[in-house]
Amino acid sequence: MIQISNLILAADVSPEVAGSSGFNMIASFFAAALLIVIPAAAFLIFVSQKDSLERTSATRRR
């Protein structure tokens, strides 16, 4: 932890900029989850349920 703070001080980065950058990084993780991960998971669950229903109905026809 001391090495990171020394690096920030040596790079002449203000604490406000470092805090803002950290906040934006975390916000981008949440945005990625909302825009990519959640819709992809919902789609995969939908396809999986649909496939399960098709296999169940195909088994009953035999």
UniProtKB/Swiss-Prot annotation:
The entry's keywords: Membrane, Photosynthesis, Photosystem II, Thylakoid, Transmembrane, Transmembrane helix
Superkingdom classification of source: Bacteria
Localization per record: Cellular thylakoid membrane
Membrane topology: Single-pass membrane protein
Gene Ontology process terms (BP): photosynthesis
Pfam families according to UniProt: PsbX
Membrane-traversing stretches: 26-46
Cellular component annotations (GO), alphabetically ordered: photosystem II; plasma membrane-derived thylakoid membrane
Primary location class: membrane
Family matches, as InterPro entries: PSII_PsbX, PSII_PsbX_type_2_subfam
Family: Belongs to the PsbX family. Type 2 subfamily.
Function noted in UniProt: Involved in the binding and/or turnover of quinones at the Q(B) site of Photosystem II.
Subunit structure: PSII consists of a core antenna complex that captures photons, and an electron transfer chain that converts photonic excitation into a charge separation. PSII forms dimeric complexes.
Protein name per the record: Photosystem II reaction center X protein
UniProt organism field: Prochlorococcus marinus subsp. pastoris (strain CCMP1986 / NIES-2087 / MED4)
Gene name in the database record: psbX
